[in-house]
Amino acid sequence: MKIKEQFFFKQEASKNKIHFISLGCSRNLVDTEVMLGILLKSGYEATESLEEADYLILNTCAFLKAARDESTDYLQRIIKAKKETAKIILTGCMVSKHKEELKPLLPHIHYVLGSGDVEHILSAIESKEYGEKISSKSYLEMGEIPRKLSTPKHYAYLKIAEGCRKRCAFCIIPTIKGALRSKPLDQIIKEFRLLLKMGVKEIILIAQDLGDYGKDFSADRKSCLDKVLKEMLKEPGDYWIRMLYLYPDEVDDTIIDLMESDHRLLPYVDIPLQHINNRVLKKMLRTTSKEQILDLLTKLRTRIPHIYIRSSFIVGFPGETDDEFQDLVDFVREGWIDNLGIFSYSQEEGSVAADMPDQVSQSVKSKRLKILSQAQKQNVEKHNQKLVGQVVEAVIDGYHPDSELLLTARFYGQAPEVDPCIIVNEARLVSGFGERYLIEITGYVGYDLIGRVVKKAPGE
């Protein structure tokens, strides 16, 4: 799992300096941005320096044990590096269900907030005594909320729901995040318009499962995602809307129709499949079969031939046999999936699968992870070869992390943070980040493409 650190905005000296570290997924990042906005609006100032901060807020991740270990490591680093008078506020998924793993470090914590309880960040910071408030309250239930974006100015995440209705055997997210809570449609559209007004050109919709949106309040318990998309697409402008985390049983003809008819709803979907063997899928408590998955992927690629499909798979699920794993390898080699995240099964306490017999050894899981990763890499190389010589419209994200002589860009088939990018090595025509250009693909290295800027994209 990719765990990232987000630091925010250095401003002038103040006795009320705050420093945020946000770990885990983009949904966590949105919560961090809201907390940051609340504090900035209240007169606090943000600093990039951990050592200078008066208040340090760590938003933890608990998706897997590796994520919890990373959260603990960051907390230890903060405790050692902070100045003596600084206070630490701990929040996020880990404190809601795995606080016992933090017990040795709790004496160093000034305040503990439950996952998503962003509303109380101000009271936590201003509390004169050590405190704790573990609740499932989400900012989705609040009214007007400030938010300070930490992403590059041209893209932002828009969370439309919190919690999860699914009960997959390997997952503990429902016990951490609670039941599905959909954000009111009018609030979503208000935030969408505000992001556009701020100059955001790519809005990435996120939830535990976008397709579950509205099932907690609609009379027929059906998804209302199509209503959200239709309302958004009424807004004028040449923006991009990208969908992440859409379960396979929630991708219906209405969603496909919208992608087909309006280029602003990008032909890109992130569909977590997790496996392809029917016995394993059943043990995982997934609601789709291999046959249904193949039918869906065939429909998507028939209706929208240029679509990009992202997915995730788990190797080494309890009881997974060599033959069942080979089914997964064969499926990946068929090239159905463009961008893929692969995880070794993690035995998470509290999940159904944690108590299953026939747990797969770590050595076998590591071997299977390597085999499946290699199969996908071969697919990507074949696909990248076909792209060489083509010209794509792409947005310039910024400098490449390895060198300011290079830039990074993305076309519609590449989501930020999770997918490969285009490495731009000829960019004399670029006048600003966040703008779209026509880029000729000249080669590739690993998963990433290499390209040169031809000219500005039409409309820029």
From Swiss-Prot:
Main enzyme class: transferase
Keywords: 4Fe-4S, Cytoplasm, Iron, Iron-sulfur, Metal-binding, S-adenosyl-L-methionine, Transferase
Cofactor note: Binds 2 [4Fe-4S] clusters. One cluster is coordinated with 3 cysteines and an exchangeable S-adenosyl-L-methionine.
Domain of life: Bacteria
PANTHER family named among the record's database cross-references: RIBOSOMAL PROTEIN S12 METHYLTHIOTRANSFERASE RIMO (PTHR43837), RIBOSOMAL PROTEIN US12 METHYLTHIOTRANSFERASE RIMO (PTHR43837:SF1)
Annotated InterPro entries: Elp3/MiaA/NifB-like_rSAM, Methylthiotransferase, Methylthiotransferase_CS, Methylthiotransferase_N, Methylthiotransferase_N_sf, NA-bd_OB-fold, Ribosomal_uS12_MeSTrfase_RimO, rSAM
Binding locations of [4Fe-4S] cluster 1: C25, C61, C93
Listed NCBIfam families: 30S ribosomal protein S12 methylthiotransferase RimO (TIGR01125), MiaB/RimO family radical SAM methylthiotransferase (TIGR00089)
Claim: Iron-sulfur is one of the keywords in the record: yes
GO cellular component entries: cytosol
Reaction equation(s) it catalyzes: L-aspartate(89)-[ribosomal protein uS12]-hydrogen + (sulfur carrier)-SH + AH2 + 2 S-adenosyl-L-methionine = 3-methylsulfanyl-L-aspartate(89)-[ribosomal protein uS12]-hydrogen + (sulfur carrier)-H + 5'-deoxyadenosine + L-methionine + A + S-adenosyl-L-homocysteine + 2 H(+)
Record Pfam families: Radical_SAM, TRAM_2, UPF0004
Protein name (record): Ribosomal protein uS12 methylthiotransferase RimO
